[in-house]
């Protein structure tokens, strides 16, 4: 069933959609995501069920010919693959979770303009999280908008200040969301 709900900031819209879910799992997929394998969703659900996980994510890959963006995503995947043992992070473009756990954790935090996926993911138990060995595809638009160094610096600062509420309150989100 498809139902159109009122929009708003990303966290708000995702939480309103999650309120409508009547199944044991919620799968958040951004509209511009592409898959490289037809079994990606099935394999993610299988991992969640067979390993009794609460949260499953994928690796990200650039689907256009931008070598710098491809390298940027590869570096991000490498860092996320190392950090997954300490801080779970399922990128919001593909995030599969148990509804019960999503509700228990309070859903996506609605007070920040970006990184809602990180703030929710880090609440999950690392033992109940897995990155499945599949990729979802993204284009290079964020790199184009913010510049390659700008995007890398943005991610580094966000990670560094991840526990600093004042940083997030004063962050200029327009650079991330604006169209070039």
Regions found by a protein language model. Name each.
Residues 121-137:
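Catalytic donor-sugar/metal-binding loop of nucleotide-sugar-dependent glycosyltransferases
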Residues 22-23, 91-105:
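Conserved nucleotide-sugar donor-binding
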Residues 5-21:
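Glycine-rich, basic loop-to-helix element that forms the pyrophosphate-binding segment
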């Amino acid at each position: 069933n498809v139902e159109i709900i009122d929009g708003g900031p990303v966290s708000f819209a995702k939480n309103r959609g999650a309120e409508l879910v009547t199944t044991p799992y919620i799968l958040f997929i951004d509209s511009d995501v592409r898959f490289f394998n037809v079994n990606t969703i099935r394999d993610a659900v299988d991992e969640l069920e067979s390993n009794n996980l609460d949260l499953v994510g994928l690796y990200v890959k650039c689907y256009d010919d931008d070598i710098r963006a491809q390298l940027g995503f590869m570096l991000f995947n490498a860092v996320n693959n190392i950090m997954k043992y300490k801080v779970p992070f399922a990128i919001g473009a593909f995030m599969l979770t148990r509804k019960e756990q999503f509700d228990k954790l309070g859903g996506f935090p609605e007070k920040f303009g970006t990184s809602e996926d990180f703030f929710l993911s880090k609440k999950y138990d690392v033992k109940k999280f897995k990155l499945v060995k599949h990729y979802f595809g993204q284009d290079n638009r964020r790199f184009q908008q913010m510049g390659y160094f700008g995007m890398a610096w943005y991610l580094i600062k966000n990670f560094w200040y991840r526990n600093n509420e004042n940083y997030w309150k004063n962050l200029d989100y327009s650079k991330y969301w604006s169209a070039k």
